[in-house]
């Protein structure tokens, strides 16, 4: 199974982060993604990294889960870093070949982008590992509630997002099963050039799509059997409650923002 995939999984627990209101965690995660772009020097990234490490320690979840969360996107991160490093001009030139050059600014910006990617993935992983899918769906629905004024389907969108998030690990597990079955029949996904590798993936996509549609149909049938008719007039078994600890967390992010502004100057 594809146990390497962490994003989308939930690990039950009773830590400080687990007990936070899902609305606070969702707001904090989006806020974090926004303020990380305020960092423009190494002192700022050290501050953000220390803040992230402290948040991870409060979750009581092993750091290896967060490191494994980076692996599926590692090649994309490295590709982005390489482009930034090779095509950014400015500062001392370390290497020059045609339009490709490695400069002081390019290396610095590349490392900054790497740090941004990793820290954002860490914080996003922290959100999904400590928040149950139903809680996340309720939080999204609550935060999007003002859009009901313009007839936006808030409940349906929040349900769709939570189901999509929940089924990411399931689809990856299904992909691994299909790949193992085809390897047993002699298919080698790592053999040949790029075109041959792409052709080898085609037989993988068809059963994966069939399996996905079957799962979607089973889910729809189960929801209809339980009387699901949308969010109109629907009551909730679990009511979200905002506590002092949630306010403290948001205040902590405000302090982080102030610290980043100070370090920028």
Predicted regions and their residues:
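Transmembrane alpha-helix interface motif
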Residues: 1-44, 48-59, 142-145, 149-152, ...
């Amino acid at each position: 199974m594809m146990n390497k995939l962490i994003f989308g999984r939930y690990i039950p627990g009773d830590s400080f982060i687990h007990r936070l209101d899902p609305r606070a965690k969702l707001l904090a995660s989006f806020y974090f993604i926004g303020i990380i772009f305020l960092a423009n020097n190494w002192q700022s990234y050290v501050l953000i990294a220390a803040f992230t490490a402290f948040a991870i320690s409060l979750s009581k979840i092993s750091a290896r889960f967060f490191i494994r969360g980076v692996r599926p996107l590692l090649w994309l991160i490295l590709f982005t870093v390489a482009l930034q490093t090779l095509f950014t001009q400015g500062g001392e030139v370390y290497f020059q070949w045609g339009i490709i050059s490695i400069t002081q600014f390019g290396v610095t910006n590349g490392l900054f982008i790497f740090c941004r990617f990793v820290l954002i993935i860490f914080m996003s992983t922290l959100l999904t590992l400590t928040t149950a899918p139903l809680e996340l769906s309720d939080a999204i629905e609550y935060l999007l509630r003002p859009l009901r004024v313009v007839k936006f389907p808030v409940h349906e969108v929040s349900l769709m997002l939570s189901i999509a998030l929940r089924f990411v690990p399931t689809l990856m597990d299904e992909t691994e099963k299909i790949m193992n079955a085809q390897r047993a029949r002699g298919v080698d996904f790592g053999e040949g050039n790029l075109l041959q590798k792409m052709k080898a993936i085609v037989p993988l996509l068809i059963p994966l799509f069939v399996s996905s549609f079957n799962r979607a149909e089973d889910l729809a049938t189960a929801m209809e059997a339980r009387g699901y008719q949308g969010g109109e007039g629907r009551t909730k078994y679990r009511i979200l409650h905002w506590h002092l600890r949630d306010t403290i967390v948001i205040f902590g992010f405000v302090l982080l923002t102030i610290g980043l502004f100070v370090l920028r100057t």
